[in-house]
C-alpha cells in the first residue's frame, strides 16, 4: 500500500515517521521544505499534492483547519482530482462535523471514501505512536 501524507507539523511529522518505521511506503508533502527533507532522510518520497493523489492508495492529512483541508483536497488542482476511483482519504484534522460531511460528500461523488479521524494525545503520543483515534465514516 502506498500512503500519501500531507501536513508535517508538530503532529504530522512524527506520525509520518512512525509509518516509515513500520515499513510503509510513504510519500509526503509539506509547506515546510525542512520538514519534507527531514522525512526524506527517513526514507519517505517527497512529491507535490497532485502526484500524491495519482500515486497513493491512501491519502492522510493532518492540517490545522477545515479551509486548509478543503483547499488541499478540493481546491484547484487538489489531491482529489488526481485520486483513483475507490481510493481512501483519512483526515486527522479536528474538523467540525459540517465541514467533514461536506468534504466527504464531495469525495463520495468522485468515488473516494473518506474517514474522519481526529486524534487525541498531543505531540508526545504522536512521537511514541500511541495516539487515540476517533474514527467516523461510512460503515462499509
Protein language model annotation of sequence segments:
Residues 50-117:
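Rossmann-fold NAD(P) dinucleotide-binding segment
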Residues 1-61, 87, 123-126:
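NAD(P)+-binding Rossmann beta1-loop-alpha1 motif at the extreme N-terminus of oxidoreductases
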Residues 18-21, 41-43, 73-76, 103-107, ...:
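Short, glycine/charged-enriched secondary-structure capping and boundary segments
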Residues 9, 33, 63-66, 97, ...:
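Alpha-helix N-cap/helix-start capping motif
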Residues 29, 62, 93, 135-136:
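Active-site-adjacent beta-strand anchor residues
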Residues 3, 95-140:
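Rossmann-fold dinucleotide-binding core
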Residues 8, 19-20, 39, 63, ...:
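Generic leucine side-chain signal with a strong bias for well-ordered alpha-helical environments
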Residues 7-15, 78-81, 89, 124-125, ...:
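Short, flexible micro-motifs
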